[in-house]
Amino acid sequence: LRVKEGLAMTLADLKHVQKYFRDEEQRDLTMTELKVLDTYWSDHCRHTTFETILQNVTIKAGELQETIQRAYETYLKLREEVHGNRKVMTLMDMATIGGKYLRKHGKLDDLEISDEINACSIEVKVDVDGKEEDWLLMFKNETHNHPTEIEPFGGASTCIGGAIRDPLSGRSYVYQAMRITGAGDITKDISETMEHKLPQSRISKGAAAGYSSYGNQIGLATTYVKEIYDEGYVAKRMEVGAVVGAAPKANVKREKPCPGDIVVLIGGATGRDGVGGATGSSKEHNDTSLTKCSSEVQKGNAPIERKLQRLFRNPKATRMIKKANDFGAGGVSVAVGELADGLNINLDSVPVKYAGLSGTELAISESQERMAVLIEKNDFEAFRQCAYEENLDACIVAEVTEEPRLVMYFQGEKIVDMSRAFLDTNGVRGVQDVEIAEGERDHDPFAPVSSNILDNLRKPNVACQIGMAEMFDASIGKSTVLMPFGGKNQLTPAQVMAAKLPVL
């Protein structure tokens, strides 16, 4: 079944699903339920790799063994102080332990804490025409490594599109962006391309065109652009888009969903593009990925997302929103499914690009430029009017229910019906023994300084990247403080990006 349906879940996950439907629901699951679970529990949506339990950690002998051991022991001490033995050891815990430690010691009091975690949000004071206001400043980054390898233009354009929508769901206006990518040697002859892969030069140029096209159309200043060249990126491309957004705190409310509240879908229509995107990016590439996975890459439409940005900058609209989510990986099943414990979703209400979509496709399609907002039912007409003023569609697709179950209807039939408790298990958690090996040096530290300098100067990483950087508009919005290049000849790359907040 895993191979036939191309599932991302493990055999242990399938047995977990089988046991639940046999013992609790006492029926066979539908194909839509299987696909929804495969999507909802995918590595892309639930970070299953980073949440894998780590055990039996060993550090191999080598010149860096003591350094690695000290770093590991530092983590163990922080972990003991922050949460003792209450949590298992994971890569996610290692990545976040520093922030948790600082927060415990009162050094992150400006961090906004809420159920909505689509972006890192901090509270700041902002000078607006001489008057100090409370604002929320939000940071987010997104990777689109898998789709950019398959379809460079579309993968990179939807990378920045998805990155924008995360702070947008927090009701902030995204005004600044950074792009950091990794590629192999783009100067190699096409004949040397790895089998079943696109040439590195094609990926690099196509991705730069896609990201810059989307960002320039939507009106986002991209002020830091850097591509890193290393043979390690031949096996897996790196495509990272990072954004900064901000909004007056008074325009943002965070409230719990209540039975009778509704979920409104706003933005673009739904098609087959992006079906299987979350699960596809959670699986290994093989010799058929290049030819069979292009439909998993969404088709971006920047002008629609620009309208969404304008709508979310309208305080009349944002003050009606209790909770919001963007339609990224997983489509309806995740964007709507995460907003409340109990939901009745009507897939027939989802606007479509063309006729013929099945209930499964409507449930997991990742068509872009869509947002889900949770509002009170009495606010719908006023909210829809705000959307219409930006030439955006707005329709009710779900209602919050008392019973904690995710239910979906299509053409009068119930095609998904499962408990929130089961859905939130996120499948079967992986367990992994760990052996830390020492990496290889990319240069001889004992070679003469002159030869090391000359060797570095031959590498593409020290070459000027102004040609690529100038594809990206760095001045739109009039808030840029540091331009990408400076110095006497305007050829020295800036090491940071800085911009003023987008106050009106």
Model region roles, listed by residue range:
Residues 1-504:
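Glycine/proline-enriched, intrinsically flexible loops and inter-domain linkers
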